[in-house]
Design a protein with these regions (language model features):
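Short, small/polar residue-rich loop motifs at catalytic or cofactor-binding pockets
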Residues: 14-16, 33-36, 54-56, 75-76, ...
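Immediate flanking context of iron-sulfur cluster ligation sites
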Residues: 202-205
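A motif-centric feature for acidic-aromatic and gly/ser/thr-rich catalytic loops and repeats
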Residues: 1-2, 118-186
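Acidic, glycine-enriched catalytic cores built around paired aspartates
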Residues: 195
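A residue-level detector for well-ordered beta-strand positions
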Residues: 1, 20, 40, 59-60, ...
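Beta-strand elements of repeat-based all-beta scaffolds
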Residues: 1-12, 17-21, 26-32, 38-41, ...
Length: 214
């Protein structure tokens, strides 16, 4: 069910019965079903700052340019380094490099090489294999052996995930948050399970449906 603002308010079917609530600015504030409840909080710039679920808390922190520079997933803190909006590295809470990313020759979303868990005893490059959309399908180690394998639905929901190495980059080589299943797309968050953004398109660039994913 949708309201007059094209906001999804009720999702039923396939044993699902989920209700959605929004604030006056069009931000998703609550997702509720018989199995779970998620509460979404925002700052004065309509940036998502916190998501609380049944058994998790995720906090998002942003820099002056609006990029998410840090994420707290329960008790784990990860910091990010960007260049022109492109993620180049992940740092741990102490500021030590955990991973650095190397870009390929295609558009910025195509990450072709992941280098390293940067500890002296566990330093190894891994390599991304992408499909025609730029989505990560395989991750190979230095010997060419498959470490990770992914399959996605038409709207980007991960339907198969076989992992031996931690990886944030998934559909369209974008960052998926493990606790929430949302994709961080810089200006907004995308929910692949329903094929919609959690916030309105403030630029009004994608037609009348301000939550649609194109």
């Amino acid at each position: 069910l949708y309201n007059s603002r094209n906001q999804l308010t009720q999702l039923t079917g396939d044993d699902k019965n989920i209700s959605y609530t929004y604030d006056p600015a069009g931000n998703l504030t609550e997702e509720h079903s018989t199995e779970h409840k998620k509460i979404y909080s925002y700052d004065t710039y309509n940036r998502n700052t916190e998501i609380n679920g049944n058994d998790f808390t995720q906090k998002n922190h942003y820099d002056a340019e609006g990029y998410r520079y840090s994420i707290e997933e329960n008790d784990k803190v990860t910091n990010f380094v960007y260049r022109c909006g492109i993620m180049l590295a992940e740092l741990d809470e102490a500021g030590n490099q955990a991973k650095t990313y190397t870009l390929g020759n295609e558009y910025a979303g195509h990450v072709s090489e992941l280098n390293n868990s940067l500890t002296s005893e566990n330093k190894a490059a891994s390599y991304y294999i992408t499909d025609e959309q730029g989505s990560i399908r395989y991750i190979l180690d230095q010997s060419g052996e498959v470490q990770n394998y992914y399959q996605y639905s038409a709207f980007g929901e991960t339907i198969i995930s076989e992992e031996t190495t931690p990886n944030r980059l998934r559909y369209n080589a974008q960052t998926e948050d493990e606790l929430t299943g949302l994709y961080y797309l810089r200006a907004r968050y995308y929910a692949p399970g329903i094929g919609r953004f959690t916030q309105e398109d403030v630029i009004y660039n994608d037609g009348l449906n301000l939550y649609a994913f194109h």
